[in-house]
Amino acid sequence: SISPDFVRIRTAVVKPGTELYDDFLTGKYTLCSDDEKILEIRRLIEASETEGTVLVSDHIINLLQQVSGRLDTDRNRMLGIIDGYLGMPEEERVMFRLARRMAKVISPDDMKRLSEADIEDIRHIMYTTADSYSLEVKINNMMCSFI
């Protein structure tokens, strides 16, 4: 049984120059989506039975940076943030993911503060990307600049 006092979330980024990146290029490793990562974090929060454990998501590479708190007292709030994101229409989730990876927003609520030019830039990336996996590759490449 593991009972940590502190859990810090760090989203995986596959960076050029690493063995994992080489595996990615050869197809031995495939990227998972931000939504899959969020679901994994949700499962961690939901299944944790520890008392007093502090969970933080305090880095720009984490999609939902505001998911932080004590697992015993803030669990429902953190799950609410995650469920709010997962409940967004797919297009809005993709736009938020791109805006976040472009360092333009921190939370989905920040999307309403974007300029029309920013929104057009995001839409251009979204609509000119061939498929969802190609989008994950673009997002991973954007995140490389943060580490």
Spell out what each predicted region is:
Residues 3-8, 12-147:
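Auxiliary Fe-S-binding modules of radical SAM enzymes
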